[in-house]
Amino acid sequence: MAKASNTAAQRVRKKVKKNVAEGVVHVHASFNNTIITITDRQGNALAWATSGGQGFKGSRKSTPFAAQVAAESAGRVAMEYGVKNLEVRIKGPGPGRESAVRALHGLGIKITAISDVTPIPHNGCRPPKRRRI
């Protein structure tokens, strides 16, 4: 019985944090929420944060301030991995697009490139009908 507990103790290893100098920030800004994912060059996720995960609920999730708080949270975790330079890829029409980039710049991370990768349909699916309030 003692051997079983010894092998269980040996299996537990401390996770080694990899040191990544350059990364890519994927900012997905929808009308309802903002999702920020920081990956390495190969696309492996290092850190992520959302406006809803930062405690904002309902219509407050879709504010620029909520996107700023989420970007700061993800940026701090990425800095623990040694990230110094980031390339930003923005997707979506939401209000948190610009404030997320400004928040990352404010943390002291160098932004090397900003690109808009919003998918634009070549007359694909029919969009939802207009809201009448």
UniProtKB/Swiss-Prot annotation:
Record-linked SUPFAM superfamilies: Translational machinery components
Coiled-coil ranges from the UniProt annotation: none
Gene Ontology biological process terms, A to Z: translation
Presence of the UniProt keyword Ribosomal protein in the record: yes
One GO CC annotation: ribosome
MF GO annotations: rRNA binding; structural constituent of ribosome
InterPro entries tied to this protein: Ribosomal_uS11, Ribosomal_uS11_bac-type, Ribosomal_uS11_CS, Ribosomal_uS11_sf
Cystine bridges: none
Transmembrane stretches, start-end: none
Keyword DNA damage attributed: no
Top-level lineage group: Bacteria
Keywords of this entry: Ribonucleoprotein, Ribosomal protein, RNA-binding, rRNA-binding
A Pfam family matched in the record: Ribosomal_S11
Entry's family note: Belongs to the universal ribosomal protein uS11 family.
Function description: Located on the platform of the 30S subunit, it bridges several disparate RNA helices of the 16S rRNA. Forms part of the Shine-Dalgarno cleft in the 70S ribosome.
Quaternary structure annotation from Swiss-Prot or TrEMBL: Part of the 30S ribosomal subunit. Interacts with proteins S7 and S18. Binds to IF-3.
Protein name as annotated: Small ribosomal subunit protein uS11
